Amino acid sequence: MAGPLPPLNQEAAFQKLQEYYDSSGKDLNIKDLFVKDAKRFSKYSLRLHTQNDGEILLDYSKNRINDEVWDLLLALAKVRRVDAARDAMFSGQHINITENRAVLHTALRNRGTDPVLVDDKDVMPDVRAELAHMKEFTNMVISGVWRGCTGKQITDVVNIGIGGSDLGPLMVTEALKPYGKGLHSHFVSNIDGTHLAEVLKKVNYETTLFIVASKTFTTQETITNATSAKTWLLEHSKEPESVAKHFVALSTNKEKVTEFGIDSTNMFGFWDWVGGRYSLWSAIGLSICLSIGFENFEQLLDGAHYMDNHFRTTPLEKNAPVILALLGVWYSNFFKAETHALLPYDQYLHRFAAYFQQGDMESNGKFVSKAGKAVKYSTGPIVWGEPGTNGQHAFYQLIHQGTRLIPCDFIAPAQTHNPIAGGKHHKILLSNFLAQTEALMAGKTVDEARAELSKAGLCGNELDNLLPHKVFVGNRPTNSIVVKKVSPFTLGALIALYEHKIFVQGIIWDINSFDQWGVELGKQLAKAIEPELDHCNEVSTHDSSTNGLINFIKANWK
């Protein structure tokens, strides 16, 4: 078995990239590269053919790369053993080394017949059994067979969870609203009581189903919110038995679930080889099923499985997740880009960037290697974004004319679910999608800006004073991803595409992308502070800042 990887910056392939960057790479100009190569788009784009959902296009030609850069990046992927790491994940090896766990969210969407082994046990029978349980329950609720404590049909579903138990289902139910089956979906995550209170104002206790999503059924925020929701239900129903009609659990803790009042037959389980931020494919996706129906949930799984197969079987140079990952490494580790923008030109995808903030930053926001050594190179970027065209009127100014390099992914569907005004809205949206990547690449030179101002009637000092402000340097890198339509299948494929991109980058950086110890310290300290908020006495047990904050808050309770 191959030994541990050397630090990335000591890897010969990395050093060759650094040498090329220093000598030529930093000066690559995307606009010039297009002038020199008429076939650049066909060379640096990829079309993935699906059976029923059209093609998925990845255009990565508007990047600061040429053949030399690309060959060096691929060489880096090979020496970092990306292919072997990929195979280890799919084969059920315990690649989450700090928790000694397999990483097999891909098994949840395995639509084939091959076994998937974890510790020599095929997990697929259990996966299929849980899916069958989800299907049965989903159909009962949507059809009206399952009813509330007063006999009324369920109209609203409230998912109570946090982190991966909230962000994924929320993003997907929003993205797939056109496929909704009529139930109204609500999500409560924040321990701030306002979140729950505002949702409860909108629903009727007789027709509301609560989903409590917590593997251990001990997550503080989730159980606190669930307990308050139960209190609200009982205040209205006056019947303890009503809990079983209005609450189900996504958990593996049967004792805690039944103690809460939920019938254990309405408990949906998952496994320790499913990480929270990769769990929407599991029982955590029950709220998705109830929103769009189980058949559409299966299409979501199918799309992810399609991308899994592409990632697993395609050579690195034509592998979409690998391509995105390598481009990210190029900008993060050589151009020192600190952020990456996800910019979907589809309103239904308005939570996509927020979802992958967790997916990327919780996975690759690490400063030590798998061997526990502090790394001396950049790892995970800050991920952010908003839907177009809203972002254009907010932060694109900085992307176009700011001092920081911000690589961007633009995502758009060729077809809209809402072709209102004869499709006019969507044509305007797409024209902006297309124009932005062109503008970021080409920019506007001094001469072009001068000619434009002259044509507008400016001259002399007035022109000279305004001229520098009208110049766009350009050469801003972008990827464009186009799907035929946002469907359950294409959304599943998009999510899996980014999941695998994150995985590949983690392998190259030699970090564990599947733990999240960074969330623990704050929670530990919060437990120590919470009892200090049970009384009005001043505290002096912390640093002066924390003491001052606690005492100021207490003083303002009066």
UniProtKB/Swiss-Prot annotation:
One cellular component (GO) term of this entry: cytosol
Pathways involved: Carbohydrate degradation; glycolysis; D-glyceraldehyde 3-phosphate and glycerone phosphate from D-glucose: step 2/4
Signal peptide (UniProt feature, chain positions): none
Gene3D superfamilies attached to this UniProt entry: 1.10.1390.10, Glucose-6-phosphate isomerase like protein, domain 1 (3.40.50.10490)
Its EC number(s): 5.3.1.9
Annotated keywords: Cytoplasm, Gluconeogenesis, Glycolysis, Isomerase
GO MF annotation: an example: glucose-6-phosphate isomerase activity
SUPFAM superfamilies: SIS domain
EC class: isomerase
InterPro entries: G6P_Isomerase, G6P_Isomerase_C, Phosphoglucose_isomerase_CS, SIS_dom_sf, SIS_PGI_1, SIS_PGI_2
Keyword Isomerase carried by entry: yes
Main subcellular location of this protein, as a coarse class: cytoplasm
Pfam families (alphabetical): PGI
Catalytic reaction list: alpha-D-glucose 6-phosphate = beta-D-fructose 6-phosphate
Entry's localization field: Cytoplasm
GO biological processes: canonical glycolysis; fructose 6-phosphate metabolic process; gluconeogenesis; glucose 6-phosphate metabolic process; glucose homeostasis
Catalytic residue positions: 362, 393, 523
Family: Belongs to the GPI family.
NCBIfam families (alphabetical): PRK00179.1
Matches recorded under PANTHER family: GLUCOSE-6-PHOSPHATE ISOMERASE
Protein name in UniProt: Glucose-6-phosphate isomerase
